A protein has these predicted regions:
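Loop/turn elements at helix/coil->beta-strand transitions in domains of secreted/extracellular proteins
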Residues: 72-75, 104-107, 126, 145-146
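Bacterial N-terminal signal peptides that target proteins for export
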Residues: 3-16
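Short active-site neighborhood of thiol/selenol oxidoreductases, capturing the structured segment around
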Residues: 65-88, 200
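Bacterial N-terminal signal peptides
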Residues: 13-26
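Thiol-/selenol-based redox modules, centered on thioredoxin-like
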Residues: 164-220
């Protein structure tokens, strides 16, 4: 009987130890979560983070060549994902802004978290990039795909290199708009505000955007 009681006590002590470790682990996890709050979205006027991207199937003659964002005044960053239904719903409306962006001396950069088949690029000649490690999505605090980010050049700058397979430095560019094309992913509403179009229209007058951030609709 004494031997049986001692064994039971040892088992009970082990169970109590495991339970105590579980409680401590839960407390540490809660404390860690509380100490690292979720980052807020980028806001109008903030400096644009650099982009760490890989080009989509760059020709060999371009892999080590330099290109420059010399004449562009506006950049539209499209963070998309072909696996997300909302991306395909919004895609025609984003592509439809290509001429408007060009009128503003702008460029569209299409950024995906995955490789892309050539038949899935938005249009011939589109500047498509891969963010395989999620560095650019993290830097721009992207929570849902698709998300559109409009950047504006603050002033004339020296020749800042736009390099294949390297970081795109955007030191003199600032955030002007972050959000969706509009608040109607399915495109069925009549008379709904065209948020991205209005932001681009504002930028033809100044750097001020009346509504610089909107809710995004898509996949986390």
């Amino acid at each position: 009987v004494p031997h049986f009681s001692k064994l039971r006590l040892q088992q009970l002590a082990i169970l109590l130890g495991v339970w105590a470790l579980w409680l401590v682990g839960g407390a540490l996890e809660t404390s860690s979560t509380a100490q690292v709050p979720e980052k807020a979205p980028l806001r109008w006027g903030e400096r644009a983070p650099g982009l760490h991207l890989q080009p989509f199937r760059a020709p060999l003659r371009h892999r080590n060549s330099r290109r420059y964002l010399k004449n562009q005044k506006i950049l539209l960053l499209v963070f998309g994902d072909i696996a997300c239904p909302a991306y395909h719903l919004y895609l025609p409306r984003i592509v439809g802004l290509k001429e408007k962006i060009a009128e503003l001396n702008g460029e569209i950069l299409w950024i995906y978290p995955h490789a892309l088949d050539s038949n899935l690029i938005p249009y011939p000649g589109a500047k498509v990039f891969k963010d395989l490690l999620g560095q650019s999505m993290g830097a721009y605090r992207i929570a849902r795909l698709p998300t559109l980010v409009v950047l504006q050049k603050d002033r004339e700058q020296a020749r800042i290199p736009f390099l294949w397979s390297r970081k795109i430095r955007l030191g003199n560019w600032s955030i002007r708009y972050v959000g969706a094309v509009d608040q109607d992913p399915e495109g069925r509403a009549i008379g709904i505000r065209q948020d991205l179009v209005e932001a681009l229209r504002d930028l033809t007058q100044s750097s001020y955007v009346r509504i610089p951030a909107t809710r995004t609709h898509g996949c986390p």
